[in-house]
């Protein structure tokens, strides 16, 4: 789990550095693979959609965002299904894992710790558990799309100069930035449904990093990007709820594990109060 968190944090930081660190004017360089095959087609498609909605680039961006999310949705659902399967295996293996972790805490020598860690790996192998085998691919696929979208907005004077609702698409908007951050914060809490308290603690840093990054970038990026995040985040929250409904009932042991951990935490809290 720690290794997976490190990978995801690296990916998110990479996206942040790419967006905030690239200060070149995209209109000055129209050549190259990225510009030719990603940025320009993106710009053309947004303008194409805008023609059908009265030249409203805000609505065109919303439609484009929903189309992007719909295209990525099968991959996200497949990843979510794999994650549910992994949670199910972890729930079944939990008694053995807890016993090994308890002995690992009591271990006094490095040799003893190494032997116990080998036992842990044996349990993972026994139940075919590999926490890092899924989870990063959808994020990696979205990164070039996000970058193309960002530069398509910056490189198009038509999009950048358009006003939608109360904000200009080419300029930062604090209110929309906060909305985008809050949407992804809500999405984080939705995504934690079904996870055990222990897993929620492990995922807390990486889970909160995404809305913080989105909020930070949206304060300085064109508001069209914050619009993309806000709409995409709402879609993702709905998709996550659908995923939980589709797959969680197939793995009742996940709910049992979560309920047992909640009951255990309540017992510990009551004991602490009595003291």
From Swiss-Prot:
MF GO annotations: membrane insertase activity
InterPro entries tied to this protein: YidC/ALB3/OXA1/COX18, YidC/Oxa/ALB_C, YidC/YidC1/YidC2_Firmicutes, YidC_ALB_C
S-diacylglycerol cysteine lipid attachment residues: 22
UniProt-annotated location(s): Cell membrane
Pfam families (alphabetical): 60KD_IMP (PF02096)
Residues covalently joined to lipid (N-palmitoyl cysteine): 22
GO cellular component: plasma membrane
Signal peptide: 1-21
Entry annotated with the keyword Cell membrane: yes
Entry keywords, A to Z: Cell membrane, Chaperone, Lipoprotein, Membrane, Palmitate, Protein transport, Signal, Transmembrane, Transmembrane helix, Transport
Biological process annotations from GO: protein insertion into membrane; protein transport
Topology term for the membrane: Multi-pass membrane protein
Membrane-crossing segments per the record: 48-68, 132-152, 174-194, 212-232
Recorded superkingdom: Bacteria
Main function: Required for the insertion and/or proper folding and/or complex formation of integral membrane proteins into the membrane. Involved in integration of membrane proteins that insert both dependently and independently of the Sec translocase complex, as well as at least some lipoproteins.
Family under the similarity heading: Belongs to the OXA1/ALB3/YidC family. Type 2 subfamily.
Protein name: Membrane protein insertase YidC 1
UniProt organism field: Listeria innocua serovar 6a (strain ATCC BAA-680 / CLIP 11262)
Phylogenetic lineage: Bacteria, Bacillati, Bacillota, Bacilli, Bacillales
Gene name of the record: yidC1
